[in-house]
């Protein structure tokens, strides 16, 4: 479970039966929660090696770099692991917005349906499909 590295104890993330771990992206300055996604080992390794957030899309069944299409990258400054080692936080600098709907955070709606954020971009313009 743990690997020793000098004076540090390296943590081995516990991926679920599908090889995934939930990842919360959190703004490193404001501490706002930006999004929840999933990562496999390859995504975590790429995040560590490149410094940019990578995730695994469960709906598309593929690895993806946050912002690869929109340009709204997440520069990862630190990766935190919870006490059970089965959830991760990426502390990030978010370029523009995290949510594909155009909001800074994917958590822009309250349970009663009211919107608590401001749309930062038009998704129809950013995600134009080439014909």
From Swiss-Prot:
Cellular localization per UniProt: Cytoplasm
Cofactor(s) the protein requires to work: Mg(2+); Zn(2+)
Reaction equations catalysed: 1-(5-phospho-beta-D-ribosyl)-5'-AMP + H2O = 1-(5-phospho-beta-D-ribosyl)-5-[(5-phospho-beta-D-ribosylamino)methylideneamino]imidazole-4-carboxamide
Gene Ontology cellular component annotations, sorted alphabetically: cytoplasm
Gene3D superfamilies: 4.10.80.70, Phosphoribosyl-AMP cyclohydrolase
BP GO terms, sorted: L-histidine biosynthetic process
Source organism superkingdom: Archaea
Annotated Pfam families: PRA-CH (PF01502)
Molecular function via GO: magnesium ion binding; phosphoribosyl-AMP cyclohydrolase activity; zinc ion binding
Enzyme Commission identifier(s): 3.5.4.19
Binding site residues for Mg(2+): 82, 84, 86
Record's function text: Catalyzes the hydrolysis of the adenine ring of phosphoribosyl-AMP.
Subunit structure: Homodimer.
NCBIfam families the record matches: PRK00051.1 (NF000768)
Protein name in UniProt: Phosphoribosyl-AMP cyclohydrolase
Source organism per UniProt: Methanospirillum hungatei JF-1 (strain ATCC 27890 / DSM 864 / NBRC 100397 / JF-1)
């Amino acid at each position: 479970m743990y690997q020793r590295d000098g004076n540090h104890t390296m943590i081995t993330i516990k991926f679920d039966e599908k090889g995934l771990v939930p990842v919360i992206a959190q703004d490193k300055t404001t501490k706002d929660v930006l999004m929840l996604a999933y990562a496999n080992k390859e995504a975590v390794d790429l995040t560590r090696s490149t410094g940019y957030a990578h995730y695994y899309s469960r709906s598309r069944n593929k690895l993806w770099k946050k912002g690869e299409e929109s340009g709204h990258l997440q520069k990862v400054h630190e990766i935190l692991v919870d006490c059970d080692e089965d959830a991760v936080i990426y502390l990030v600098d978010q370029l523009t917005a995290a949510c594909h709907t155009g909001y800074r955070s994917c958590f822009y709606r309250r349970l009663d349906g009211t919107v608590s954020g401001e749309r930062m971009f038009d998704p129809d313009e950013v995600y134009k499909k080439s014909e």
